[in-house]
Amino acid sequence: MEGVLYKWTNYLSGWQPRWFLLCGGILSYYDSPEDAWKGCKGSIQMAVCEIQVHSVDNTRMDLIIPGEQYFYLKARSVAERQRWLVALGSAKACLTDSRTQKEKEFAENTENLKTKMSELRLYCDLLVQQVDKTKEVATAGVTDSEEGIDVGTLLKSTCNTFLKTLEECMQIANAAFTSELLYHTPPGSPQLAVLKSSKMKHPIIPIHNSLERSMELNSCENGSLSIEVNGDEEILMKTKSSLYLKSTEVDCSISSEENTDDNVTVQGEIMKEDGEENLESHDKDPAQPGSDSVCSPESPWEDNEEVIPTFFSTMNTSFSDIELLEDSGIPTEAFLASCYAVVPVLDKLGPTVFAPVKMDLVGNIKKVNQKYITNKEEFTTLQKIVLHEVEADVAQVRNSATEALLWLKRGLKFLKGFLTEVKNGEKDIQTALNNAYGKTLRQHHGWVVRGVFALALRAAPSYEDFVAALTIKEGDHQKEAFSAGMQRDLSLYLPAMEKQLAILDTLYEIHGLESDEVV
């Protein structure tokens, strides 16, 4: 069972609405269903807690583990409280009955095992005696065949009985104790099917310490699954990893590759038809015959100029790749994939100190994605999602897709401002971050969040370390061609990003969706 209940937080905040989930005998609560991917804020085991109905307030109930946990809850109505009481009571009763039955079976099996072990010791002693008797007969050289057959028959019978009893002991032990060792937690423990930013790494043989990139796997059920691989190591994926990539579409800078089993779309390194990467395509004439990755004749780089790939040129999806639809419609899926692709920039700045910023950005992406997957045919563009919520009068409701997109575009403006500072030649990363923050997010943050950001600035990397993190191949940042490559890639990336953010700004201004709320 799941639903909203009011939980007593403290004397300052009082009763606050929380989303509760009862699953597997455990009651967990979250800020909202959309925030469930962050993990529960608290939980209580129904089998060991007491359910108390308030004597005065007919909408209130208390869940108590004496001396440990106290959940003071209120329903929105008497009928709703009754439904929760029935569900909680049933869960507690089922778990209690199950535990009682298991304890009873465990006690019986323990007793049976003790009995069998006593029999085993008896047969063991008997075996020792019969072996000694057999030795005596053999040593004495007794020729009475009848006595010899009698001793041998007894020994064989005792051995068979000993082995049979030992087997019974093992069967009892397996039935009684193995399951207890396997299940330290109840088998029905809740496995919450919520949206998570799940990440997995494929077993690719490492070449060097290179930049990590992410590929997005769209799931109809729970959003997007991000698979992290190393950019330069994509060339080994066909032979070294479980993803078999097939080249299907080639243009000047990217190729689209599709895994037929998992519908994984990869845009990045250009591959030959035989599946091998043309590693020298960056060092040779782009129009060299025999290569499948042929750039157009209008290539702005000269034949002898080394073209070094960067983080932005090897993105699996980029804002510069997005083609706007009719009436400047921004395609939802491509936009969200591009947002995911730029998130690793925050890891280059500091995976720990910038974790809250990254979490907020990813959380807003997921909220929009959750809305999108409810009706992919209708919500093909971001504008359609916003207009749908405007018409339903839920655009400014907390945790709506419109609100999530509002904060998402603010976060993207911050990243764009920072990258613009770097492109314009700012060598101090702290200064670049501070300037970008002051122009974008600072006006929407209260003094607490501003203080957190100020602390994060102190841990910002040096310009050299940040640039090194944007390389695909270790040591490329020391080459002169890398700076030109960064300028080239950002000159394509940032204007495309700015254009789409400007479209969203216009949309929000027209419908009065901008908010002055400070967090």
Swiss-Prot record:
Membrane topology value: Peripheral membrane protein
SUPFAM superfamilies: Glycolipid transfer protein, GLTP, PH domain-like
Superkingdom, natural source: Eukaryota
Start and end residues of each PH domain: 1-93
One example of a Gene Ontology biological process annotation: ER to Golgi ceramide transport
Principal location class: Golgi
Subcellular location: Golgi apparatus, trans-Golgi network membrane; Membrane
Annotated spans, Disordered: 275-302
Keywords: Golgi apparatus, Lipid transport, Lipid-binding, Membrane, Phosphoprotein, Transport
Region (Glycolipid transfer protein homology domain): 330-473
GO cellular component, one term: nucleoplasm
Modified residues (Phosphoserine): 145
Pfam families xrefs: GLTP, PH
SMART domains from the UniProt entry: PH
Complex and partners: Homodimer. Interacts with ARF1; the interaction together with phosphatidylinositol 4-phosphate binding is required for FAPP2 GlcCer transfer ability.
Domain notes: The PH domain of FAPPS binds the small GTPase ARF1 and phosphatidylinositol-4-phosphate (PtdIns4P) with high selectivity, and is required for recruitment of FAPPs to the trans-Golgi network (TGN).
Role this protein plays: Cargo transport protein that is required for apical transport from the trans-Golgi network (TGN). Transports AQP2 from the trans-Golgi network (TGN) to sites of AQP2 phosphorylation. Mediates the non-vesicular transport of glucosylceramide (GlcCer) from the trans-Golgi network (TGN) to the plasma membrane and plays a pivotal role in the synthesis of complex glycosphingolipids. Binding of both phosphatidylinositol 4-phosphate (PIP) and ARF1 are essential for the GlcCer transfer ability.
Official protein name in the record: Pleckstrin homology domain-containing family A member 8
Organism: Mus musculus (Mouse)
